[in-house]
Amino acid sequence: MRKINSAFATLGLAVCLSASMASWGWGGQPIQNVNDAAIVSVKPLQVAQVKTAIMFAGTSLGWKMAEVGPGLIQGTLNLRKHTAVVDIPYSATKYSIVYKSSINLDEKDGHIHKNYNSWVQNLSNKIGGELLRP
């Protein structure tokens, strides 16, 4: 009986420690940027067309997109109490999606909330789809 109680105590301690680690922001995923994704299109595109595709893709997914300079868009996604901000540098041949900042996504030491990477991947997939439109 003592062994069983000891096992339950150990299990309880492990559960509490895991919960504490999660609340401290541990256990997040490494931030995955999209770096120099090649622009695939049925015909060569101008920089303005790439910009339009990126802006439309982001907006259609709920991102607020703003041109902050030539060849640079900033995307902001607000979901409930979470905010993700990315920089999207682009040219006629490639684009990137790079983590800039966040609120309530537990970013620390290059790791972040598990949902962040899927939001960025969805954005990249949507951009790719828009670039393929005739």
Language-model region placement:
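Bacterial N-terminal signal peptides that target proteins for export
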Residues: 1-12
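Ser/Thr-rich, low-complexity intrinsically disordered terminal regions
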Residues: 24-134
